[in-house]
Amino acid sequence: MSSVYDGNLTVSIFGQSHAPAIGVTIDGLPAGLPVDLDALGRFLRRRAPGQNAWSTPRKEADLPEFLCGLKDGRTCGAPLTAIIRNTNTRSGDYENLMDIPRPGHADYTAQVKFGGAQDAAGGGHFSGRLTAPLCIAGGLCLQILARQGVRVRARIVSIGTVTDDAAFDAPVDEKPFPAVSDEAAAAMQAQIAQVKAEQDSVGGVIECVIEGLPAGIGDPMFGGLENRIARTVFAIPAVKGVEFGAGFAAARLRGSENNDPFCVENGKIVTKTNHCGGILGGISNGMPVVFRAAFKPTPSISREQDSVSLSRMEETKLVVYGRHDPCIVPRAVPCVEAAAAIAVLDAVMERKKELGYGY
């Protein structure tokens, strides 16, 4: 199972939604880096379930236990492993899913891939629960990047038909609902409440901005910065699309409209616009890196759906039980930050190797 990000950093995520624990092992972190466990805890709480009306009622403390890799509050050079114990599981809600797969979920493809050996409870290894260890790894990477002047921040751009058009010039990480406009946030919450009452779900779009990244980070072709970021962001369950800068809208522009003119500002080369999203030829150009990730609606919904019985090879009806988010987008905001931070730190480490100096 491909649950390992392998670069200058190696990030291996393990566990299942209803297993005794989930966790992550990170190899390649330089020794001696300080780790702020309080800040990491605050970051993980932004993703934690059971905190409000628009998330799953499953409550988990999500307290990381570091088994190795830390000594006296600093990385010690050894692989770092942390786990989060699962304490609130109801596996009985999922017993029928080995035979009747949920539409939109990985139940059927997992059955084909693993021949019935997979753990279906809570979605098993395919569950959004596995974004908790992703956030442990990404939270540590965020701290390392911040000490180098690189800031990664994300916000909700849209949920369903509601869009937040406000400029991303205010922090949202301490808001209970991470949208810039409070008016848009209220409308988004109302839409989530509506689909929840209708036993349905809704998706949305998250925007991420990476500031302070110098020019020259990344590579052409397969090692491009877009490639690295997209690869990690697609590890988040429910992500169905990633676009950088103007993204798909660039296909409707002319070159004279899409090109970002260069200029000199305070002795530094910058661009007057940022349609490229801070990346040219797979390499950062010194402008903010901007991308958006599209999230599909949560596939586990309570209304009756059409499916099939795999054992009987006939069509049947399915009602999904269990505890699920009517919209996973609000809790996914720190996950996008975490995924981006892993990719960016890996690319920064690559650049330092190219320049011939240590971390």
Report each predicted region and the residues it spans.
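Glycine-rich, mobile lid/loop segments that gate access to catalytic sites or pores
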Residues: 113-221
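Alpha-helical support elements that line or immediately flank enzyme active sites
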Residues: 20-32, 128-150, 223, 227, ...
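Short acidic, glycine/tyrosine-flanked loop/strand segments centered on an H-E-D-like triad
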Residues: 98-124, 306-324
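Glycine-rich, N-terminal phosphate-binding loop and its surrounding beta-alpha-beta segment
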Residues: 44-109
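N-terminal, positively charged regions that mediate nucleic acid binding
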Residues: 1-58
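Glycine-rich anion/phosphate-binding loop at the beta-strand->alpha-helix junction
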Residues: 14-20, 199-202, 206-315
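Internal helix-turn-beta structural module
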Residues: 18, 300-359
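A short glycine/serine-rich beta->alpha loop
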Residues: 10-13, 118-130, 215-219, 276-279, ...
